[in-house]
Amino acid sequence: MVCILGSFSAQAQSDRFIFGFFPEASLSYKLSEKYSVTHKVESQHGLYDSNNLNEELEYEHSLTDLQSFIGRRFSPFVKVDIGYQYRIEEGENTHRTIQQVSILQRASFYRIGHRIRIDETFFKDAPLLFRARYRLKGQIPLQGLSLDPGEKYLAVSNELIYMIQSSEDDLENRFAVSLGFYFDDKNKFEVGLDYRTDDYLVEDKFRHRLWFKIGYYKSL
């Protein structure tokens, strides 16, 4: 539904469009059979912003996020994580606490992941920002009915985010599609597009962001 709203809003003259580069990397390792730790870094680098008067390509560092999670696996299909994020961006660096539940569904040739997350962002001189998020992600092998080392896969996800700060609320939607390279159980690489729309509830400020995204995911 949110994607449909986005397609309608895209017709407005006041829409803002941003394009850029979005690299990310993560490192995961086990503390025990049930507990694990994940460290992640991701960074957004803007190359085009329709709000610029000259409408030319111009590089701008948007933000960099440093994240750490500790998770407990309750079964092969259910995991709970708590995490912390430090965001570096122009104006003010922020702190964020994160809580999430991940549920995995496996079938003969595909897998579907559900993630329910809430997070709280703390600012120096602004009220707390609270967000509730749900992400649905599917993954299918592109070479045969199972994913084996050295093969490729397709990953598609959509995430809906509700946020509220003081008395003001908003919605954001994130749709991503990527081509994955499964080297082995400990190494994966993905390249794709991440399309985000937000400011649904802000009059005349609807925003599109399209990121060219690459990611490397390492497990020890």
Q: At which residue positions do the language-model features occur?
A:
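Outer-membrane beta-barrel "beta-signal"
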Residues: 101, 208-220
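Residues that define the transmembrane beta-barrel architecture of outer-membrane proteins
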Residues: 17-21, 62-64, 93-97, 126-134, ...
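Transmembrane beta-strands of outer-membrane beta-barrel pores
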Residues: 41-47, 84-90, 105-109, 118-122, ...
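Short loop/turn motifs that connect adjacent beta-strands in outer-membrane beta-barrel proteins
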Residues: 33-34, 77, 91, 106-111, ...
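Start-of-domain marker
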Residues: 13-74
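Bacterial Sec-dependent N-terminal signal peptides
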Residues: 1-15, 220
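Transmembrane beta-strands of outer-membrane beta-barrel proteins
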Residues: 37-39, 78-82, 110-116, 132, ...
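Residue-level signature of outer-membrane beta-barrel architecture
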Residues: 29, 72, 103-105, 140-142, ...
